[in-house]
Curated annotation (Swiss-Prot):
The gene is rplS. Belongs to the bacterial ribosomal protein bL19 family. It comes from Aliivibrio fischeri (strain ATCC 700601 / ES114). One of its GO terms (cellular component) is cytosolic large ribosomal subunit. InterPro entries: Ribosomal_bL19 (IPR001857), Ribosomal_bL19_CS (IPR018257), Ribosomal_bL19_sf (IPR038657), Translation_prot_SH3-like_sf (IPR008991). This is Large ribosomal subunit protein bL19. One of its GO terms (molecular function) is structural constituent of ribosome. PANTHER family: LARGE RIBOSOMAL SUBUNIT PROTEIN BL19M, RIBOSOMAL PROTEIN L19.
Amino acid sequence: MSNIIKALEDEQLKQDLPKFAPGDTVVVQVKVKEGDRERLQAFEGVVIAIRNRGLHSAFTVRKISNGEGVERTFQTHSPVVNSIEVKRRGAVRRAKLYYLRERSGKSARIKEKLAKK
């Protein structure tokens, strides 16, 4: 029975996702339905958490909008998520960056990861 479930889940996994990690700045294109029409809405921010659970994987993106912190959790393989683009790589030493919630201004900045030679 579990082989059937695994086969169905593998079928629904997205294959075209870029590799991203906590600390990276990403732009998530989200499909938004307004009445009878559908459009794409960009949500740009820092990835503060990733949850790897196969088809049920999720990630949380945080941004500052009008001086207010906004966090949004996306299901990685959801049809609502159209695309994910990595803008810059962040150099962090934690898997969960929840400490950024208490920080503001310059202390909330993340160093950029330098490319390996």
